[in-house]
C-alpha cells in the first residue's frame, strides 16, 4: 500500500470534474493545478458510457460545453475540439446545436488528454473517505482509500461521480441477471446473444427508458419489447425558450436564495423539462417505428401507458410482473425474460457522501452557494459536491448547462480559502 498527497482530489472524471480541472488549469495558479488529481474508475473518459448509441444526441447545446460560458476564448471549447479533429466545417454544415452523444463524449476524452498540469489517474475507485483531524479535533483534510489498498490524502475533496442508480423496491427481489438499469445498458446487452428471442420489458417514461426501448430492436432483433409507462403516455419534455431560462447559470442565485418550500415547488414544476419527457425529434421517431411495425409487420413492440408494476418475481423460469391498469384498477401478470429500468437515480446524496457525513457527525448534508459542504468554521479541509444539489441549486445542477459557471464558483472558493480571505462565493 502506498500513501500519496494531493492538494485537491476529485472523485470522478466526468463532465463536472473535467470542467473544474479546466478552470483550475486556466486559473494561473500553477501550485493549485499541479496539486490537483482526478480519480476515474474506468480506463478512459466516457460520457453516459452505457447509453452511447450511435444515433443518440445530446439534449444540450454544444455552446454549453465545459468552458465556453466561462471563457469563450479557451482552448478547451467544443469548437476547438472540432477544429483540431478536422471536422469543424462539416459540423457547421449539419446545422445543429445538438451533437451526437458519442461526439461530445469524444470531446471529454480530448479535454482529459489535453490537460497539462492537472493529473488524471484511471482505474482508480474510491472505496472509503475518512476525515483527517487536527490536534484541536477540526477537519484538516481527507484520507481516501482506494479499492486496490492505496491511500491518497488531500486538503480538499470534490465528489463528482454522479448519483447512484435507483432500483424501485418492487424490483429489489429479482435476480441481478434479469435486471438491467440504464446505467448498465450497453455493457449488459453486449453479453446477450444477438439472435436470442428475448421477451424484454422496459419500465419508465423518460428519455433513457425510451432510448433502451428503441435500441433493443437493433441490439436484439429477435426480441419482443414492451414498454410500461405509468403516466398517460410518452410526451415531449418542455422546450419553451421562456422555461429554458431557468437553466441559465444566473438563475442559480435566485433559486438558491429562495425559501425551501418555494424551491420545492419550482423543482416540481420543472420536472417535465428534464426528468419526465423525451426530446421531440426522438419521440416522433419512436412513434414512427411503432407505426411501421403495425403497417408492415412484424409487430414486435408495444407501449402500455397508465400501467404500473405492483409486483415482481421469478416463477417457472420466467420473470412475472404484476401490472395494474390505472384506469380499470385491474391487475394482470406479464411474463418476460428481462426487465430494463429507466427509473433514474437515487435522489439522496451518493452513498460515499452519506457515509462520509456520518463519520464527521453530520445528520443532514448541506452545501453553500459554492457547493461546499458545511463543516463549521474551524474546518480547514473542504468537501465540494457536484451535480447532486438540485434542492438548493436548481434542476440544472445535474446537467451540463451550468458546468462552466459552477467550476468558476468552486475555483473562486478554493482560491479564497487558500488566500485566507474567507469563503469566497460560498455564502
PLM region spans:
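Glycine-rich phosphate-binding loop and adjoining beta1-alpha1-beta2 segment
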Residues: 46-65, 243-246, 278
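Generic low-complexity, intrinsically disordered sequence content enriched
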Residues: 24, 55-56, 67-73, 220, ...
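A conserved beta-strand/loop capping segment in the N-terminal third of enzymes
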Residues: 69-101
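Flavin (primarily FAD) cofactor-binding/catalytic cores of flavoenzymes
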Residues: 1-43, 91-207, 211-427
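Short, solvent-exposed beta-strand-terminating loops
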Residues: 58-76, 234-237
Amino acid at each position: 500500500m502506498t500513501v500519496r498527497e494531493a492538494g485537491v482530489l476529485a472523485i470522478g472524471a466526468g463532465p463536472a470534474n473535467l470542467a473544474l480541472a479546466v478552470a483550475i488549469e486556466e486559473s494561473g495558479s500553477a501550485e493549485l493545478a499541479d496539486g490537483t488529481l482526478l480519480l476515474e474508475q474506468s480506463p478512459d473518459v466516457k460520457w453516459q458510457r452505457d447509453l452511447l448509441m450511435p444515433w443518440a444526441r445530446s439534449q444540450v447545446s454544444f455552446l454549453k460545453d465545459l468552458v465556453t460560458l466561462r471563457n469563450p476564448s479557451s482552448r478547451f471549447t467544443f469548437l476547438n475540439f472540432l477544429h483540431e479533429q478536422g471536422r469543424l466545417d462539416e459540423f457547421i454544415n449539419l446545422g445543429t446545436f445538438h451533437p451526437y452523444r458519442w461526439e461530445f463524449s469524444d470531446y471529454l476524452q480530448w479535454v482529459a488528454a489535453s490537460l497539462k498540469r492537472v493529473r488524471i489517474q484511471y482505474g482508480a475507485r474510491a472505496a472509503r473517505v475518512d476525515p483527517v483531524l487536527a490536534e484541536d479535533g477540526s477537519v484538516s483534510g481527507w484520507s481516501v482509500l482506494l479499492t486496490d489498498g492505496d491511500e491518497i490524502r488531500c486538503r480538499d475533496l470534490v465528489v463528482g461521480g454522479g448519483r447512484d442508480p435507483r432500483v424501485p423496491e418492487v424490483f429489489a427481489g429479482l435476480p441481478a441477471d434479469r435486471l438491467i438499469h440504464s446505467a448498465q445498458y450497453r455493457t449488459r446487452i453486449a453479453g446477450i446473444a444477438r439472435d436470442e428471442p428475448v421477451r424484454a420489458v422496459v419500465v419508465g417514461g423518460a428519455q433513457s427508458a425510451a432510448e433502451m426501448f428503441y435500441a433493443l430492436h437493433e441490439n436484439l432483433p429477435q426480441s419482443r419489447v414492451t414498454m410500461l409507462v405509468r403516466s398517460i403516455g410518452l410526451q415531449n419534455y418542455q422546450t419553451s425558450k421562456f422555461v429554458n431560462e431557468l437553466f441559465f447559470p444566473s438563475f442559480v442565485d435566485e433559486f438558491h436564495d429562495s425559501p425551501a418550500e418555494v424551491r420545492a415547488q419550482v423543482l416540481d414544476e420543472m420536472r417535465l423539462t428534464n426528468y419526465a419527457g423525451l426530446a421531440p425529434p426522438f419521440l416522433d421517431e419512436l412513434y414512427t417505428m411503432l407505426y411501421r411495425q403495425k403497417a408492415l409487420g412484424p409487430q414486435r413492440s408495444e407501449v402500455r401507458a397508465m400501467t404500473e408494476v405492483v409486483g415482481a418475481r421469478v416463477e417457472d423460469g420466467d420473470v412475472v410482473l404484476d401490472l395494474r391498469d390505472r384506469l380499470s384498477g385491474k391487475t394482470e401478470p406479464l411474463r418476460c425474460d428481462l426487465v430494463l429500468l429507466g427509473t433514474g437515480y437515487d435522489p439522496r446524496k451518493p452513498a460515499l457522501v452519506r457515509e462520509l457525513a456520518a463519520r464527521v457527525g453530520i445528520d443532514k448534508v448541506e452545501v453553500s452557494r459554492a457547493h461546499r459542504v458545511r463543516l463549521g468554521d474551524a474546518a480547514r479541509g473542504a468537501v465540494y459536491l457536484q451535480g447532486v444539489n438540485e434542492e438548493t441549486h436548481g434542476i440544472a445542477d445535474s446537467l451540463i448547462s451550468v458546468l462552466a459557471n459552477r467550476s468558476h464558483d468552486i475555483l473562486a472558493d478554493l482560491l479564497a480559502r487558500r488566500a485566507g480571505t474567507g469563503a469566497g462565493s460560498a455564502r
